[in-house]
Every structure is written in C-alpha cells, then in structure tokens.
From Swiss-Prot:
It comes from the Bacteria. Its cofactor is FMN. It catalyses: 2 a quinone + NADH + H(+) = 2 a 1,4-benzosemiquinone + NAD(+); N,N-dimethyl-1,4-phenylenediamine + anthranilate + 2 NAD(+) = 2-(4-dimethylaminophenyl)diazenylbenzoate + 2 NADH + 2 H(+). HAMAP family: Azoreductase_type1 (MF_01216). InterPro entries: Flavodoxin_fold, Flavoprotein-like_sf, FMN-dep_NADH:Q_OxRdtase_AzoR1, NADH:quinone_OxRdtase_FMN_depd. It holds the Pfam family Flavodoxin_2. Binds 1 FMN per subunit. Its EC number is 1.6.5.-, 1.7.1.17. This is FMN-dependent NADH:quinone oxidoreductase 1. Quinone reductase that provides resistance to thiol-specific stress caused by electrophilic quinones. Also exhibits azoreductase activity. Catalyzes the reductive cleavage of the azo bond in aromatic azo compounds to the corresponding amines.
Amino acid sequence: MNILRLDASMRKTGSYSRILTDKLIEQLTSGKNNEVTIRDLADGIPLIDENWIKANFTDVDERTCEQKVCLVASDILVDELYKAEHIVIGLPIYNFGVPAAFKAWIDQVVRSKLTFRYGDNGPVGLVENKKAYIIIASGGTKLGTEIDFISDYLRHILGFIGITDVTFIDSSGLGRDESQTLAHAHKAIERV
C-alpha cells in the first residue's frame, strides 16, 4: 500500500496532530508491505504567483522552459498524490482555518486538466480511488460546531479533485479536556 503523509503543523515537536498521525501510520502499516511518502509542510511549500498561474493555464505543449520549471514543485506534489492509495493528513486548526502551508499545498495540487476537469455537468475530480484520513487537532475549536470552518472545506476541496472517501479523526478541543479528547482520537485510530 502506498501512503502519502502530510504533516501541516508548524510545530516539529510537541504537536498533537503529528503524534496522532504517527499512531495512525503505525496502525495502517502494521504487518503490511507499505511505502510511506512523507511531506512535511513545515519545511515549506511554494506559494503560487502570477508566473505559476500563467504556466498552469498554458497548454502543456506550448509551455516555455521557464514555465515548466515554474511548475516542477507542483508536478512533484501532484505525482505524490496520484501514487498514494491512502492520504493521511495531520492538520491543526490555526485561527479557525487550515495552516497557510496546507492551503499552499492545496493550491499546488488542485489543477485543471490534471486533478480535475470541467465536464458537461460541472467539475469532475480525476484523483479517484483514494482514501483520506484527516486528523484534526485544536485547542478550542470543536468539529461540528458553528465555528468549524475546516471539515466542510476539506470535504469539498478533496471531493472536488475526486477524493470522496474521507474519514476525520477528531482531536479538537484539546484545551478543554486533553485526556478525554486524546482517548477518543486513539480509539478512532484503533478502529481504522
């Protein structure tokens, strides 16, 4: 099984999303022959800019060498996504949203004619037959509440590119009851 692991926490140590992602990866790979690609978003993801936009919307056969170079990082990230059967995302909530590095990753992989296309009835996701696990960690923002702006966004953007089998592992609200929240998350991981 090929697994793509995305770590979105900017904290390299002491991060609950990273700790729980370690546990989930261990659960998924136990006793199996697996390849895990680790993409640590804290190491940096290029932001898209005007040159990237121009290159992306230029037909592949018409791209200049500079435009091809501009898209190299994006092409690598898209390739990692396509190779994976499972995508495991460790995601903290920062200021009621996803970390900037995760949004940068989304911008790099959501590409017309590559990960989605427009059909007669609207957009069609091209990244099919994938399973996504998303570990959400937060101090106070609880999933499923009126201030949860993340879960619907993630379901939508992943579904937009074709990833519709999404499981959330909830470790939100750690600031309220850390031990109970972590126990819940560990049980959810064991059920995977």
